[in-house]
Swiss-Prot record:
The protein's name: ATP synthase subunit beta
Locations listed in the record: Cell membrane
HAMAP family in the record: ATP_synth_beta_bact (MF_01347)
Subunit structure: F-type ATPases have 2 components, CF(1) - the catalytic core - and CF(0) - the membrane proton channel. CF(1) has five subunits: alpha(3), beta(3), gamma(1), delta(1), epsilon(1). CF(0) has three main subunits: a(1), b(2) and c(9-12). The alpha and beta chains form an alternating ring which encloses part of the gamma chain. CF(1) is attached to CF(0) by a central stalk formed by the gamma and epsilon chains, while a peripheral stalk is formed by the delta and b chains.
Predominant cellular place of this UniProt entry's protein: membrane
Membrane topology: Peripheral membrane protein
Function: Produces ATP from ADP in the presence of a proton gradient across the membrane. The catalytic sites are hosted primarily by the beta subunits.
Entries under InterPro entries matching the protein: AAA+_ATPase, ATP-synt_VA_C, ATP_synth_F1_bsu, ATPase_a/bsu_AS, ATPase_alpha/beta_chains, ATPase_F1/V1/A1_a/bsu_N, ATPase_F1/V1/A1_a/bsu_N_sf, ATPase_F1/V1/A1_a/bsu_nucl-bd
Gene this chain is encoded by: atpD
Alphabetized NCBIfam families for the sequence: atpD
Pfam families from the UniProt entry: ATP-synt_ab, ATP-synt_ab_N, ATP-synt_VA_C
Keywords attached to this entry: ATP synthesis, ATP-binding, Cell membrane, CF(1), Hydrogen ion transport, Ion transport, Membrane, Nucleotide-binding, Translocase, Transport
Gene Ontology, cellular component aspect: plasma membrane; proton-transporting ATP synthase complex
Catalytic activity as recorded in UniProt: ATP + H2O + 4 H(+)(in) = ADP + phosphate + 5 H(+)(out)
Amino acid sequence: MSNLGKVIQIIGPIIDIKFDSENLPDLFNALEINAGDRKVIAEVEQHIGDDTIRAIAMEDTEGLKRGMEALDTGKSVSVPVGKEVLGRLFNVLGKPIDGAGEFISEESYPIHRPAPSFEEQSVEPEIFETGIKVIDLLAPYEKGGKIGLFGGAGVGKTVLIQELINNIAKEHGGLSVFTGVGERTREGNDLYYEMKESGVLEKTALVFGQMNEPPGARMRVALTGLTMSEYFRDQGQDVLLFIDNIFRFTQAGSEVSALLGRIPSAVGYQPTLATEMGALQERITSTKNGSITSVQAVYVPADDLTDPAPATTFAHLDATTVLSRSITELGIYPAVDPLESSSRMLDPRIIGEEHYEVAIKVKNILERYRELQDIIAILGIDELSEEDKLVVGRARKIQRFLSQPFTVAEQFTGMQGKYVPIKETVRGFKEILEGKHDNIPESAFLFQGTIEDVLKKAQQMEI
């Protein structure tokens, strides 16, 4: 028998509904409110008194009024999962919003699910090879790890994300789920068409809950994307989950918390900030079947890293990739800052002695070059000692060798994209550090894949 209630109060996206006291819906149950020509989905957040629940709408509440009927579905919001979701674009409720025709999925999962138990989780730290030299060498990703992607507007976050999607699809046969949380609709639209053009769309599912949507949708859309990823992981796949932007997840939670009347905590954030973040992040993990590796774009409000939202996110991250405007000004792409980016995988016990030594030496030489730049700016390079001149020469070659042509940017750059295995990356940088290529001009190192490509370019330049 269906369990019906009546809407008794609506304040923006918050809806109070009266049920029989013995048939009160459970927390997180989805409710369908019949608004005549459409059904509005809301999620139960609080029980008020004996017979009333407070729900948050997942869709626009326009047209709702008191006295309307609400049906308790008896389960939480469920979204479609399976290979059918690839190449399609969904909203928080798992409804397609790409206008690409009817969508039929055989299976659906609830968005609220427990995290894998300790027994199910994989404990062996394993490197996730991206084929992008600067990441693999200096701040490697962990399979099933969480990576923070930091960078302002226009420094190449989207292109880096697309290249990662392309590389996992083509080199590892893996899949990707892109979750747009509270960002601009225009950016989502651009991403969709760019993915279509670069040919990575059929290996990706996209889930959007953008800036103009109610806070309930923005708060839950990350769980929708995560649920789709979990299905693929449980089928033995390696999945790449992108969350853009994790700050908006916290921001939406803060709005909902205030609307529900909870007393705010530090800087006006919700008192449950750490719990909500933990519930999301704990589900992103490797199991013995497969892995979910997540790359999360992190907006830092007013560049304050001590703000509770980014500070809570940091506690969960295994690696950080920092994109820097000063590197884009040098014309080096991807504009990953080799000194600011970090990873807990940079450990000789995980990556091996050789890789570790090369990475540390590369960081040291770039650090020394940064120190010498002031002297060069004032006195000129001729005033440096012979040893320092050698350091500067090698550092500039390393800096350029950290650049790389991307497959997804081929149509703009005219350069064929390169995927570089970790072994080749380590070998190339080791040879530069050993001085084997001191006689090769700097320009030969720019936008090349392996060290062999550099040697070929140098030969062409001589002709």
